[in-house]
Amino acid sequence: NMLGEREPEIYGSDTLHDHVKEAKRVTNKFGYELRHYQSNNEGDLVDQIQNAREKHIGIIINPGALTPYGWSLHDALAASEGVIIEMHLSNPNQREPWRHTSVVAPVANGSIVGFGIQGYELSIRALHQIIEDDDK
């Protein structure tokens, strides 16, 4: 949340609505249905991940400030089925040292970082490619 308002020099001027709209455009190209969820509450995110376990083919997650210490996200994602892509608008490795370690990365198929709003398209394309490769 607060995208487009908070630190636009880092996160850009696109709003959360803009990001979701772009992600839906890309998922529609591949014939997928996007289910978007945003919360500042880690427990709510865990609930969503656990509820999606057998209903979704993949999860693209931007853990934000939970990246270095969201161990409950790590555990929920580890128990998930399907593809997991970690995505960040900025590149955490170019920022403060406390942002450099991700507890999500070890359970993700891959990470897309530093591409702003384009990161969602890249993440969806990566998710699609992994699914296609698994179907071969």
Predicted regions and their residues:
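Short, structured coil segments at secondary-structure junctions
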Residues: 30, 80, 107-108
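Short acidic/histidine-rich motifs immediately flanking catalytic phosphotransfer sites
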Residues: 52-59
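Short acidic active-site motifs
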Residues: 44-48
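Short glycine-rich anion-binding loops that position phosphate/pyrophosphate groups of nucleotides
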Residues: 1-2, 64-67, 90-92
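Short beta->alpha junction loops
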Residues: 33-43
